[in-house]
Amino acid sequence: MADDNWNGTSSSNGTLFTNVRVLDATGEYPYTGEVLVQGNRIKQITKGSSRFGSSSSPYGGATVIDGMGATLMPGLIDAHLHLSWNNAPGIDPIQMMEVEEHMLVTMEMAKLVLDAGFTAGRGAAAAKPRLDVVCKKFINQGRFPGPRYLAAGPEITTVGGLGDSSPSHIPHEGLNLGIVVSGPEEIRRTVRQLIKYGVDSIKLNLSGESITGMGAEETPMSEEEVAMAASEARCRNKVLSAHARSSGSVKQCIRHGIQNIYHASFADEEALDMLEAAKDRHFVAPGIAWLINTARHAEQWGIKPGSPLSMEYERELEMCVETMKKMHRRGIRICIGGDYGFAWTPQGTNAKDIQTFVEMLGFSPMEAILASTKFGGQIMNMGDELGMIKEGYLADLLLVDGDPISDVRILQDKNRILAIMKDGKFHKAPRINEQRRRLTA
């Protein structure tokens, strides 16, 4: 039976997965084998038919899980998480939620993401200064369930930029989704303040966003401001991320060493050449679910297909698809992460990105899975211990009913995810009897 204890369960002597198809996310085709987990690490991998058949008796003191032919794969990783985005129909209900309620909702969103099989993720921005930081702390302490997480602070933006939400007659910083700055010295102070709060990364809004009124192809932050942010972040060994839809903003990311480039829809050939030359130092996460759903699936919330705003996002979606195909051909690392957290992009549906990468961006199923596992470990700056099934790696694992290589859509079906293990402990333990009926039906 499954254990519903959200704090996770594990055998003190480890867990042995037998009779599984191992999708190790190295690029190798899945193979039959068994995987031994001890503590929070993968201790041993054995290729070939299981030596234990359907036995559920302990082996070396470990609990044996007979996979009955299910797929064992790394946990999914979202490169662009907003855990404090509360599935609201717009920015105001996110920003105006009082902090006490907002903290609880953030923890609720973290559980939704983990329930969907995402065992890790990089925070892309928080709605309030310490929501991500406290969320990560509580998850790491085992007090609440959630993915392995890197915390962000609010986005840093310019006057009039994305995140500057206050009206002219009420110029109050509390009304802004981002932290509004003007000039390098204000950037310096803001970066230092966020690092004091405990963030893992600094996020800059280097381009506009159609839904806010500033065009996505605009690049409002000066070179001096970006350079200051990069300098201050490097002083404290913090990673930089950027909202960068415009070509100019993508080039700023490359010039100033901003590792994580979010969106990049309008990158021109010069930007692509620059990015290809520096592809070992950067990641791109297009946030394509936001474009698709805002353009086509948000009518219930006032964005009608065919409206000017919808058509603007359709135009960007077309550009994004072509740009990502070009990047993919150039070998640039593209990660999943669809900007989930609005009513029309709800948390917990994150695995839809994998299907979209296959159907729209020209990825093979294996490539799309690598974008959500192997490259995810790398964008977490944990590529030597996360995102693949290898001996010594962290035991963040999914047991999946079926073959995701044959049909990536099964990763969106929570009923097909038979088990979720994070850090060597089951968040969702397999229901052995039900599993056998399902897999032998």
Spell out what each predicted region is:
Residues T106-D132, P145-E155, V199-S210, K238-V239, ...:
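Divalent metal-dependent hydrolysis catalytic cores, especially in the metallo-beta-lactamase
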Residues C235, K304-P308, E316-D403:
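His/Asp/Glu-enriched, well-ordered alpha-helical/loop segment
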Residues K137-E155, E217-A242, F283-P286:
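Alpha-helix-loop-beta-strand connector modules within alpha/beta enzyme cores
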Residues A2-L16, V22, T26-M73, P93, ...:
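Histidine-rich, glycine-flanked metal-binding segment
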Residues G67-Q141, V159, E224, H256:
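Metal-associated gating/positioning segment near the N- to mid-region
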